[in-house]
Amino acid sequence: MSSTVSYWILNSTRNSIATLQGGRRLYSRYVSNRNKLKWRLFSRVPPTLNSSPCGGFTLCKAYRHTSTEEDDFHLQLSPEQINEVLRAGETTHKILDLESRVPNSVLRFESNQLAANSPVEDRRGVASCLQTNGLMFGIFDGHGGHACAQAVSERLFYYVAVSLMSHQTLEHMEGAMESMKPLLPILHWLKHPGDSIYKDVTSVHLDHLRVYWQELLDLHMEMGLSIEEALMYSFQRLDSDISLEIQAPLEDEVTRNLSLQVAFSGATACMAHVDGIHLHVANAGDCRAILGVQEDNGMWSCLPLTRDHNAWNQAELSRLKREHPESEDRTIIMEDRLLGVLIPCRAFGDVQLKWSKELQRSILERGFNTEALNIYQFTPPHYYTPPYLTAEPEVTYHRLRPQDKFLVLASDGLWDMLSNEDVVRLVVGHLAEADWHKTDLAQRPANLGLMQSLLLQRKASGLHEADQNAATRLIRHAIGNNEYGEMEAERLAAMLTLPEDLARMYRDDITVTVVYFNSESIGAYYKGG
C-alpha cells in the first residue's frame, strides 16, 4: 500500500513542479537581489549592548539600516511596560476530555509570540481532530513575508485530518459536497491572540482539499493513511497545491495576487500530532521540537525530536548533493545558505527555488504588479537543476512515557538565542516556581501579610514577577539574557524598544508553544495494556 500511495503522491502534481524526495545564524533568512536590499549581507559579529555612563542602557547599532534616528539612543521601559509587551500574545488552554475522543495525555498548553518583523511572519496553530483521534500543534515560520506561513497555518491541519479519515467518512464528506449539504466538522481550533484567516480564498482552498480527499477515496483504503504517511503526504501535497494554484487561471484579482504572494514567499513548519501515548512530529526547515524528560531519580534531560534542515546539518548537505550533479557540489551551499540565499533547506512555497526559469518567467509575465506584491524577481546564481528546495518533512515517532513531562515547539527565533538544554532548564524552573508558590499558599491561609511576605522573599531571591506562562518566560530569557546566561533588565528593555527597521537586525520573530503531558493518564495506558 505504501508504494501505491508514494506513486500517487508523486504523480498527482504537474511534471514542471514535481517535488523531490527526501552556532548561531544570520537573522536575515532570505537574501533577494542585493542591489535592492535596504541593508547588505551583514557579518556574524553580534550587535553590541553596553551600559551607559548615566546608568541607563545604550544600544549601539552594528549594521546599516534605514532609520533616521541617532546612532546611539537611550532606552528605558518600566517592569510593568516590559510585562505588558511580553505578555500581549500569550495564551493558556487546559485540554478538556470533550476536546478529545480518548482520555487525554495532554493536560494543557501555553503559547506566546513576540514579533521582530512588522508584520510578524510567524504563525502558530492548535486544533483537535473531530473525525479521528488526536491533537495537533504547529509552528510556522515565514520568510519573504507572512503570506505563506499564514496559508500553511490555515490549511496543513486539514490535509492531515483528511488523510487520517476512514473511507466511509470521506464518502460522507464527498456526498455532502455533491448534495450541497453541510460538511462534517473536521477540526476544532483552539485560538491564539491575533489569529486570522484568508477569507477571500477559503472556497479555493476547500476545492483543493476536496480534490485531495477524492484521490484518497480512489485508493480505497478503509482505515485511511497511517499517521506517519498522513504527515509526510500532507506536507508535500499542500506544497504542490500552493504551487499549482498560481499556475491556474484566476480571474479574481485578490485571489490571484494572494496566491502569488503565498507561492513566492516561504515558510518552514514543525507540527506535532498527539494521540494517547503516540507522539508524531513532522518538521520541514529549522523550527524545532524537544521533550523535557524527568527520570526516576529526579534528574531532567532534553530529548530532541527534530533536526534542523540547514547547512549545519551534514545529512542535509549529503541529501542535496545526491539530488544534484557533482558539478554543483561547490555552489549548492554558499555562505551557509541554499544557493547563497536561503538558510533552511526545506520549506513550503519559495517556488523561485523549485520551478524552472521558464515557468517562473511565464507566471511573472502575466501582468502581476510584482514590485507592489513584494515578489523577488531574480534567479539565484548557479540555478541549473531545480527544484533545489522541498517541503518533504522528517517524521519522528515517540511513544510517550510517564517521565515525558512537556514538549516545546518553537520557531528558530528562540533556538538562535537558547540551547535545547537552556529551554528545558527554564521550563523546569517555571514549574518549580509555580509549585513553590502553590505550596506556600496551601500550607498557610492566604492574607495580605502572607502575600507581602512572599513578595519580599521573591525580591530577596532575585526573582522577577513570576510569568504565569512558560512560553513567556522562554521569550523573556531569549532576548534578555547576557552572554553568561544571566537576565539583564536593561538588555531586555533595550531589545523590546528597538525601532521596527532595526529590531530584525538583533532578533527574529519568536513563537513558542509548551505542551504539558498528563503522566497519570500516560501511565494508565501501560497498566491497561
Swiss-Prot record:
Record: transit peptide: 1-66
EC number: 3.1.3.43
Cofactor binding remark: Binds 2 magnesium ions per subunit.
Single GO biological process annotation from the record: T-helper cell differentiation
Presence of the UniProt keyword Lipid biosynthesis in the record: no
GO terms of molecular function: [pyruvate dehydrogenase (acetyl-transferring)]-phosphatase activity; metal ion binding
Sites where the protein binds Mn(2+) 1: D141, G142
Keyword Mitochondrion: yes
Domain of life from the UniProt record: Eukaryota
Known catalytic reactions: O-phospho-L-seryl-[pyruvate dehydrogenase E1 alpha subunit] + H2O = L-seryl-[pyruvate dehydrogenase E1 alpha subunit] + phosphate
GO cellular component: mitochondrial matrix; mitochondrion
Entry keyword set: Hydrolase, Magnesium, Manganese, Metal-binding, Mitochondrion, Protein phosphatase, Transit peptide
Function: Mitochondrial enzyme that catalyzes the dephosphorylation and concomitant reactivation of the alpha subunit of the E1 component of the pyruvate dehydrogenase complex (PDC), thereby stimulating the conversion of pyruvate into acetyl-CoA. Acts as a crucial regulator of T cell metabolism and function, with a particular focus on T-helper Th17.
Protein name from the UniProt record: [Pyruvate dehydrogenase [acetyl-transferring]]-phosphatase 2, mitochondrial
Lineage, top ranks: Eukaryota, Metazoa, Chordata, Craniata, Vertebrata
